[in-house]
């Protein structure tokens, strides 16, 4: 706690024939972060043909999965599925090397891919045919108004026939121009249909070029003449039957597709996951160095996992390996990847720390402090027992439902579980149960403080809490800089604010505790003097401007904690409005029916659920902001290098390595 996981540097050199199995072992363990071996002028490893095939097959499998998904029945969804997701079953695969894995994938694809592609091709063909038939049916419905046999609407050897739609207001001018350019050798038939006119143009074949150009000028929408003979109205039933036949054929093909999808979908997902992990492994090959017979790698490993890693390497290589384990040197400290280490009950708060950035290896991990203060700030801003209870119930359900997955939702729900506990406690202290609902119902509620009527007191509390929060940050910054040997920064950047905050605190308490003025003035003066000296040393010529800017920056950061009061007041205010609206309609009756009670209950339930959601969102964001901007700004850079293990991502597969 407060310190990241101890990390050591592990260097391994062994025979090239062990490369694939050793990489797979490290990948499955998922406890080592691979780094590029820092040796210039030596040959780097590259993916061989099997790794390249893995990349290609990963893409192929992904496309096949997308195809068969369309034929599977829709998955269960909804709130229940979100809260209690089904755990995916894992299937074991005996890993005998990438060559054998590629052979297994090729064998599977050789069986499954042709069947899937065949169904895909058939579905595409039938969809195109149905679409074409529907277009023809639409054309027949338009042409039926002409009452002309369909064969007469097709061109002849000496005649050109164009049938289509044109804007109704343009049709007169179009007909005139047609007669002019064809010198009277043209026949037109017109049928007005709302805003469009259906037009048949018959001309000599030799004039067709000029006719078509003119039709295009007027925005003529050509209608393709369907197959068949006879009147359009007589052909329509035949086309409807043809469409039904094709749709029945399509359903049969889709049914076949569903059978294939149900047979192969899980296998496709399984093999894709295997290929994805091989693909990821290939991305790290350039980190390795090699000769004709050997290869070497460099890894960062948590100290607690080193023994397990070394034992595994020796087992896989039959002891034919050079392994060096050592602590990072002073020069390497900046480059050491950081893995946060906290007790299980607060480890989920690491997610919030990592969102900002991890500490450097020689810095303090703020997660233990953030776990308490974030939850407290959230509770202070939401500050209602019922809201906290509602949030707690939802969070508890999500924690239970995602407990086996240990995913981001599970971590977030555990954070909200803490936050809801603080919200309920502070809700009791402030006597807030859906705002003042119990007070309006005539129930006497005990409370230490009323947010609405004692807003000024709540503001003073918020500023006092903020001062304490900033003080903690400056103390931590002082400790980190002093410990890391940067004593000047500790004395000139953190210590001045420590004295200034103590001085402000003594001044605030002086009237109650009888502290002499000279005491707080002396402490404040020392802090101010150190602050000015620090500004002069650090900023030289810009010291005057930056002294004013930085001092008022501190004041701004301090006053920013007033948002604790503002959001607590907003929560109470919104709840009060909901309660007043419900109270206004409560007595409404229509005859003997107490309609107002029903409406009032709906307003109370819906309104307070909305209030919980909107105010919880505000509390979440602003509690984060107070840490990321105000608190972390006092001591924490978040510029560390996050530990990113070389780890397999497995949801449906499990590897058994044959060494």
From Swiss-Prot:
Signal peptide: none annotated. The chain crosses the membrane at residues 376-396, 415-435, 460-480, 489-509, 513-533, 542-562, 566-586, 590-610. GO terms for cellular component: plasma membrane; proton-transporting V-type ATPase, V0 domain; vacuolar proton-transporting V-type ATPase complex. The keyword Cell membrane applies. It is a multi-pass membrane protein. GO terms for biological process: vacuolar acidification. GO terms for molecular function: ATPase binding; proton-transporting ATPase activity, rotational mechanism. It is found in: Cell membrane. Coiled coil: none annotated. Keywords: Cell membrane, Hydrogen ion transport, Ion transport, Membrane, Transmembrane, Transmembrane helix, Transport. Has multiple subunits with at least A(3), B(3), C, D, E, F, H, I and proteolipid K(x). Belongs to the V-ATPase 116 kDa subunit family. NCBIfam families: PRK05771.2-1. Component of the A-type ATP synthase that produces ATP from ADP in the presence of a proton gradient across the membrane. This is A-type ATP synthase subunit I. The gene is atpI.
């Amino acid at each position: 706690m407060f310190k990241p996981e101890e990390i050591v540097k592990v260097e391994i050199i062994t025979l090239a024939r062990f490369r694939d199995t050793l990489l797979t072992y490290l990948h499955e363990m998922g406890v080592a972060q691979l780094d590029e071996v820092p040796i210039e002028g030596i040959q780097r490893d590259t993916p061989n043909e099997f790794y390249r095939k893995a990349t290609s097959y990963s893409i192929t499998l992904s496309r096949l999965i997308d195809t068969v998904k369309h034929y599977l029945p829709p998955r269960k969804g909804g709130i229940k599925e979100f809260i209690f997701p089904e755990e995916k079953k894992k299937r074991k695969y005996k890993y005998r090397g990438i060559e054998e894995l590629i052979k297994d994938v090729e064998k599977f694809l050789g069986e499954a891919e042709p069947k899937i592609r065949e169904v895909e091709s058939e579905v595409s063909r039938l969809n195109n045919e149905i679409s074409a038939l529907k277009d023809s049916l639409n054309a027949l419905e338009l042409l039926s108004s002409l009452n002309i046999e369909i064969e007469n609407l097709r061109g002849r050897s000496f005649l050109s026939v164009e049938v289509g739609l044109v804007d109704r207001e343009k049709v007169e001018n179009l007909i005139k121009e047609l007669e002019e350019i064809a010198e009277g050798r043209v026949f037109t038939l017109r049928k007005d249909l709302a805003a469009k006119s259906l037009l048949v143009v018959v001309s000599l074949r030799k004039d067709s070029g000029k006719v078509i150009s003119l039709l295009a000028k007027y925005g003529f929408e050509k209608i393709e003449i369907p197959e068949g003979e006879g009147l359009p109205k007589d052909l329509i039933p035949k086309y409807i039957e043809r469409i039904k036949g094709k749709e029945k054929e399509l359903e049969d093909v889709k049914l076949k597709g569903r059978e294939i999808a149900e047979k192969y979908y899980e296998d496709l997902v399984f093999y894709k996951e295997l290929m994805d992990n091989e693909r990821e492994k290939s991305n790290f090959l350039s980190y390795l160095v090699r000769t004709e017979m050997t290869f070497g790698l460099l890894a960062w490993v948590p100290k607690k996992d080193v023994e397990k890693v070394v034992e595994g390497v020796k087992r896989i290589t039959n002891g034919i390996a050079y392994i060096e384990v050592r602590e990072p040197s002073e020069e390497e400290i900046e480059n050491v990847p950081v893995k946060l280490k906290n007790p299980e009950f607060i480890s989920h708060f690491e997610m919030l720390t990592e969102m900002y950035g991890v500490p450097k290896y020689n810095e303090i991990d703020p997660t233990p402090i953030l776990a308490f203060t974030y939850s407290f700030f959230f509770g202070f801003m939401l500050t209602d027992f019922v809201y906290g209870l509602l949030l707690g119930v939802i969070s508890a359900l999500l924690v239970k439902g995602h407990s086996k997955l240990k995913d981001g939702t599970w971590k977030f729900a555990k954070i909200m579980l803490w936050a809801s506990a603080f919200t309920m406690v502070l809700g009791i202290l402030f006597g807030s149960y859906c705002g003042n609902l119990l007070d309006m119902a005539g129930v006497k509620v005990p409370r230490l403080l009323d947010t609405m009527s004692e807003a000024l007191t709540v503001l003073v509390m918020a500023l006092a809490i903020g001062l304490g929060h900033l003080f903690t940050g400056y103390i931590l910054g002082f400790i980190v800089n002093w410990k890391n040997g940067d004593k000047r920064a500790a004395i000139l950047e953190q210590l001045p604010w420590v004295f200034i905050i103590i001085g402000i605190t003594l001044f605030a308490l002086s009237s109650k505790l009888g502290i002499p003025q000279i005491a707080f003035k002396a402490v404040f003066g020392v802090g101010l003097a150190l602050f000015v000296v620090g500004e002069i040393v650090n900023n030289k010529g810009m010291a005057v401007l930056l002294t004013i800017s930085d001092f008022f920056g501190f004041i701004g950061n301090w006053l920013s904690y007033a948002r604790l009061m503002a959001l607590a007041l907003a929560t109470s205010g919104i709840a009060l409005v909901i309660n007043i609206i419900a109270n206004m309609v409560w007595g409404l009756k229509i005859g003997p029916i107490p309609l107002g009670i029903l409406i009032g209950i709906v307003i109370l339930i819906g309104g307070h659920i909305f209030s919980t959601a909107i105010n919880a969102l505000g509390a979440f964001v602003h509690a984060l902001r107070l840490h990321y901007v105000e608190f972390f700004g006092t001591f924490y850079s978040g510029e560390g290098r996050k530990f990113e293990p070389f780890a397999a991502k497995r949801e449906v597969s499990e590897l058994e390595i044959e060494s």
